[in-house]
Regions:
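Conserved alpha-helical scaffold segments that buttress catalytic/binding sites
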Residues: 2-310
Length: 310
């Protein structure tokens, strides 16, 4: 793999995730970490996801690479993980930010690596799916969230609840093999779930997970995606606020930390080609606990990349 020149990309250097080196220091990087410090700035009460990457990076310094007996190897070394820094975006400037995100990820894919990103709010998922689709045209989506983000979109443009609406309408994912899981709580408009169904997505509510159990959910997820290339979107508000209070739209009755991490362990071997972890809002966190959990989710994401079929 050629060494990557970041000079012409809209990136800014920041604290490396788990002290990972930059791409210039790797010769065969399989995973590139990218921060997406963007939010629409439109949430009526909880603006702050733009600060998510910096908080996750800070908490990642507490993590250690070895976790026996589950994995007794260093995933950063095995995958030659490189930290590309943060995309240089201005929150609220949607079209400009989306173009920059796509440009960075297109370059990352061209380098031979796969992206592991941290946001940022859910609006930033759309440009990432666009870039993934260009690399993997038969892409499917696995979306863990308390909201389906498949609302009817406003004529004025994008918002945090429409990323998967646009992904379906732009033909970026095969909706027949894509799924939302963990959905619960209140919605700001009537018919949100019905609209997601009309788009073709399968939706598993949190109440369904309570009945089938985590092992049952894992079976459903694996069967849905099969051997297809998977875009894994992990919205941190899929967790209960008791373990992840620092998110944009908390909703009680979610996954415990143990359950969420077990799901990630359970889908090992799927063909994960991109993962984004989003919606951490540091101003609403408690002692950095949500950001630390997000950093752990990203570490589990590295294991998923290590287990994907070659």
């Amino acid at each position: 793999m050629p060494r990557v020149d970041l000079a012409d990309l809209p990136l800014r250097r920041t604290l490396p995730f788990m002290r990972a080196p930059g791409p210039q220091e790797r010769t065969a990087s399989r995973v590139g970490i990218v921060g997406v410090p963007f939010d629409c700035g439109a949430h009526p009460l909880r603006v702050g996801a733009r600060l998510g990457p910096s908080a996750i990076r800070e908490q990642s310094q507490l993590l250690r690479p070895f976790n026996p007996p589950d994995f007794d190897f260093d995933p950063l070394a095995k995958l030659q993980v490189a930290d590309w820094g943060d995309v240089d975006v201005v929150p609220g400037q949607i079209e400009d930010a989306f173009a920059k995100i796509e440009r960075v990820l297109d370059t990352l894919y061209a380098s031979g690596a796969l992206p592991l990103t941290m946001g940022g709010d859910g609006a930033g998922t759309l440009p990432q799916i666009r870039a993934a689709h260009r690399k993997f045209p038969d892409l499917v989506a696995l979306h863990l969230d308390s909201h389906a983000d498949s609302n009817p979109f406003p004529e004025t443009g994008h918002d945090t609840g429409t990323a998967f609406t646009r992904a379906a309408q732009e033909g970026l994912v095969d909706v027949a093999h894509s799924m939302h899981a963990g959905i619960r709580g209140t919605f700001r408009m009537q018919g949100s779930l019905e609209h997601s169904d009309k788009l073709g997505y399968e939706t598993i509510l949190m109440r369904d997970i309570e009945k089938m159990g985590i092992s049952g959910l894992i079976e459903r997820l694996r069967a849905k995606c099969g051997a297809r290339p998977v875009y894994l979107c992990f919205d941190m508000d899929v967790f209960d606020p008791s373990c992840a209070p620092g998110v944009c739209a908390p909703s009680w009755g979610g996954l415990t930390a143990r359950e969420g991490l077990a799901i990630l362990r359970g889908i090992g071997g799927l063909n994960i080609v991109a993962m984004d972890v989003n919606t951490i809002s540091p101003p609403h966190d408690v002692g950095g606990m949500s950001a630390l959990l997000a950093a752990n989710v990203m570490l589990e994401g590295m294991l998923l990349f290590a287990q994907r079929p070659q």
